[in-house]
A protein has these predicted regions:
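N-terminal signal-anchor module of multipass membrane proteins
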Residues: 2-82, 90-102
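Entry/N-cap segments of selected transmembrane alpha helices
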Residues: 37-40, 113, 164-180, 230, ...
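Hydrophobic residues within alpha-helical transmembrane segments
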Residues: 38, 68, 88, 114-117, ...
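Membrane-embedded hairpin module used as a gating/binding unit in multi-pass transport
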Residues: 44, 199, 203-249
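Short, non-helical or kinked segments that cap or interrupt transmembrane helices
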Residues: 57-64, 79-92, 133-143, 188-194
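Membrane-interfacial loop-to-helix junctions in multi-pass transporters
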Residues: 59-61, 105-106, 140-143, 167, ...
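Transmembrane alpha-helix interface/packing and boundary motifs in multi-pass membrane proteins
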Residues: 71-83, 180-184, 242-245
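Membrane-embedded alpha-helical modules
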Residues: 102-214
């Protein structure tokens, strides 16, 4: 346990040759590591907060469970495979269908729970039997199609958000592209982080950021928990979602 959070400095910690990779047990200088970590947090926010907002779940509860699952994952594999376990976009369609049928979050939680159990069983099978069978059942062309379909399904929500503030969206996108093209080294790799910062500053200048929620929010709070309510009729909509994380990971 003592060496889980210990990393060796990769080279001089400042430069990386083209194609060079920083291994899981290595790190760059702390400033560069913090920058890359901050960008990963920005990338995490997309799924961790957008999915509950679109499905009606509580974002703080989602953040709590993703944090717990990530911590457990890192402890189990002893940080050999550093990763963040966020919410999956694959659940948006079945949860939306359940909500449309007025079955409630408790029923949707049951579908998520069953899907999670099945995915855990797939993980056990991969651990003991390997992953060759996944490559046979789901070749790259199938995996790519599944991931692409998820992106296409999110297009309507992206367009809705774009219409809310098209100027901010364009400024952010332009900043991301320009930083990636014009700058080399670490700054070019942090184009997402830089683009989001520029877009946020622009939104503040335009008066598009509402800070009232910060003043109204409690300093300390607890997530809103829901007990699953069994409804086997919704399982045909949820069970296929198992294929999504298998294809993504």
């Amino acid at each position: 346990m003592s060496n889980i959070f210990q990393w060796q400095l990769h080279g001089d910690g400042k430069t990386l040759a083209p194609g060079e990779v920083v291994e899981p047990d290595e790190r760059l200088t702390w400033v560069r590591t913090a920058g890359i970590g901050a960008q990963h947090v920005i990338a995490m926010f997309g799924a961790t907060f957008l999915v509950p907002i679109l499905t009606g779940f509580d974002p703080s509860t989602t953040l709590f469970f993703t944090a717990m699952s990530t911590a457990l994952f890192l402890l189990i594999n002893r940080n050999v495979l550093p990763s963040y376990l966020g919410s999956s976009f694959g659940f948006i369609a079945p949860i939306t269908a359940v909500s449309t049928a007025n079955k409630g979050i408790a029923v949707a939680s049951f579908g998520i729970m069953v899907t999670g159990i099945l995915l855990a069983l797939v993980g056990v099978l991969v651990h003991y039997a390997g992953s060759k069978w996944i490559d046979i059942i789901m070749p790259p062309v199938v995996n790519g199609a599944i991931v692409a379909i998820i992106g296409f399904n999110l297009a309507p929500s992206v367009w809705t958000n774009f219409q809310a503030a098209p100027d901010t969206a364009l400024v952010t996108l332009l900043a991301v592209l320009l930083v990636a093209v014009l700058f080399k080294g670490l700054l070019g790799r942090l184009n997402i982080l830089v683009g989001v910062i520029i877009g946020y500053v622009y939104a503040c200048i335009r008066g598009q950021v509402d800070f009232s929620a910060i003043g109204d929010a409690a300093w300390i709070g607890f997530p809103k928990f829901h007990l699953p309510q069994a409804d086997f009729s919704i399982l045909p909509m949820f069970i296929p979602v198992v294929l999504v994380p298998v294809a993504e990971n």
